[in-house]
Amino acid sequence: MLNLKIRTEYSFRNAFGPIETVISACSGDAVGVTDSGTWGHVKFAAKCAEAGKKPIFGVEISVVEDASERTRQPSNAMCFLAKNNSGLKEIYLLVTKSTSAENFYYFPRLSYSDLFDVSENIFIFSGTNPNWGMIPLSRKDDLYIELNPMSSRKALEFATAKGFKTVATSDNYYPRVTDKKAYEVLVGRNRTDRTSPMHILDEWSWREAVPWGTEEAVNNTYEIAAACDVDLPTAKMVKFKTGKTLKELCLDGAKRRGITLDADYSVRLKRELETISSKKFEDYFFVIADMIDWAKERMLVGPGRGSSAGSLVCYLTGITDVDPIKHGLMFERFVDATRDDLPDIDIDFQDDRREMVFEYLTKKYGPEKVAHLGTVSRYKAKSVISEVGKELSIPPWELQDLKAGIIERSPGDERANKCIMDTFSTLEVGKVAVGKYPAIKVASEMEGHARHCGTHAAGILVTDSPVSEFCSVSAQTGAAQIDKIDAEKLNLLKIDALGLRTLTILQDTLDQVGWTRQDLLNCPTQDESAFRILNDWKFAGVFQFEGQALQSVARQIKVSDFEDLSAITSLARPGPLMSGGTSQYIKRRTGQEEVAPVHPVFDRITKVTFGIVIYQEQVMEICREIGQLTWTEINQLRRAMGKSLGQQKFDQFFENFKKGAEKNGTLEKKATEIWQHVHAMGAYAFNRSHAVSYSFLSFWCCIAKSRFPLEFAAASLRHAKDEGQGKRLLREVVKEGLEFIPFDRDKSDVNWTVQDGKLIGGLTGIKGIGNRVAKDILERRKLRQPLTPRQDTLLSLGKTPYNDIFECERKFGHIKSDPAAHKIVSKISDIDEITEENYGSFVFFGKVKDREVKDLNERPGTRKVSGASLSLNLTLEDDTSQIICTIDRFKYPRLGLPIVADGKIGDWLLIKGNSRKGFRRIYVEKYRNMD
């Protein structure tokens, strides 16, 4: 018996089982996958190839009497299996139809009438215990009645009476008997009350579970598998119609940018064009260049992102605005000479206009050839612990230490999905948890498992033929049922078009002052007024510099060169900060430490970074020039760095480096010394192309802020993502010397504006006034018409979140400056000082914004606790940030109850509490009501 109806993790919270586990649980030389969608097809094909099994591609879709009726109807969960590639394309279209607005109702559906339109290129399985009235009697050649453990004898009787063939199937929801607990946690215990087998059955088990099953049903599994022959199609490159060659486009770009193609430029351009041509990537560059050229006429486009800034072709065609020769960037970091897959060109657009780019591509290439990329979300270690804890009724506070202590690894690490397993087996906190709750071990099976699917935030697919020839497309969302990795395997052209709020803010600023994008590009990168913004610590609104880590590094370096921006943004990351590389760079950059010579080539490559390896490109150059590594080895090394696989993986290249260095005339001792320098920072090295590209965005913000501080602040406030961010930003710009008025009855516009040298708050900042009402008020003001009574009342009150942005400082600044004088022995912190990394004991003031009482015994399906079960969550805010503070069930009677009984929203509390590593939350020890 072959298993032709198999569910995997790609049935998303309806079945458990990684594809490789599912395939290994199936006997025979062929396997059929029938998830509720086609997300897993590409990975399924790859894993079948590894296992030496034939893949049968299918899908399970519910069929109702009339899917156009938006009512709950009896349904048949029928399976459709592709006989050939035409059948596979038809399956993709069936999935698309089932997700249409007309058919979708709680879940994807097809109508009974659709079955008559299914071609002979598809096998149909009846489903388990179907509505027999919805089995089309005319489809006897390729519609099979399922016999499985959940079927009744009526299935066999119906097939015999009506002349249908039968097929033996499992009705699996997990691969092995031992996976039942993981499945229960995944879908919820109430879903698994049936007694029949839910795992994959072999023939013997099937005969035992279906004693009335027939030999014909078993034999038909082999006949069906033999009749199926599908190869997943791969896409051809999109053909871009143009009368120019890529070289001609580059030469035109050089003239437009005023570049004389001297030896450096001409040799580099020739090399890049030859590489691109040899891989037949020209059309890809034309597609991207055309899209960006169109976008630049309508919005602000980022200067570059990722490795594409290392390409001179990208610069000359206008794809990027970063000169790779001027900034010392590598083409090989962008196009891997040893691989034929398309390079990634990521582009930033204004976040409020990004969708226009998708619309342009749809119009140019046709709606059937453009789709949003899909994405699959997977269970991370900490979320798995939470899910399992709920299912096993483990009190959440008993899992806090375990979650805080879980081993953390980067996504590219080969044991990235084994963090829980390794925590349980190697760390004391894990062993204690397993000892107390043995069933929690199931969490290790769920880590990395598919959780849900969605639409990729940036990815767009463009194909030369309809996208539906390669994968299903959700009719409602326009998202393809395929993720980034699988799309690359099918050679689908993928464009990463990201929305960036900073670009929206910059364009808003330019619009206010009459500048254009070219004015920004014309600003010299040695503009001292821009650097002065950072040196004066005026970080508010400056891209990348709003985080504490970057600000800390910037405060220690007097920025005097554009190169400083790239270095700071590359060094203010956990790896360099923890390894000591950042502090060493600061010492050398500020003259506190000499730069000792190491090797002429090494010294030349690291001159710009004071003898410290900061960038991946530096590692690649050192390994190429000194270690004589091949490009294949260098690109393997680059991928190891890019995926942050750590020092052990990085050091695997040392032996070959040492041998190559010796051949190059470098003694083993010196080669080892050079490698030690590379080793110290190489595993944490950053992509220089990306660092330089994003430094331009930071630089543009500094330019805008130095020349137009009020307009830049107004734009930043207009596009703040929420009230909290707006208040924090306003506090900072006021500290930097700007003046503001929260609201002016006669001057306020819809949103923040600049008038009379001040920031004026908008009408929508007033509680109770939205965009529509604000526009009506402005129209009445313009026409000198009276306001409505309600409008007049709201304006008279003038209550905005910005009326008292320094309330905490005003009320308690004297206490914070001298806590000892007020009998407070601890330093009083600001809430923004409490982070996931900066944890421990804190004392701080906070205004109650929200409060929520929770009863542990009211959670459905959980074990009841005896005694105290109530806890209190408080949302507190000061002048810097917000944080959630928890009073647990043991402290609730003493601390929580008085707040609930006598306190109110708006009270100021002085809190003493603790936070734990990895969690930005305070557990309250004591408090004092200051009102």
Regions found by a protein language model. Name each.
Residues T71-Q73, F116-V118, H452-G454:
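Solvent-exposed alpha-helices and their adjacent loops that cap or buttress functional pockets
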Residues F16, W39-K53, E69-R72, K180-E184, ...:
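Glycine-rich loop at the start of a catalytic domain that most often binds anionic cofactors/ligands
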Residues K5, D35, P55, N84, ...:
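Divalent metal-coordination and catalytic microenvironments
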Residues D35-H41, V63, P149-K154, Y173-R176, ...:
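Acidic, metal-coordinating catalytic cores used for nucleic-acid/nucleotide bond scission
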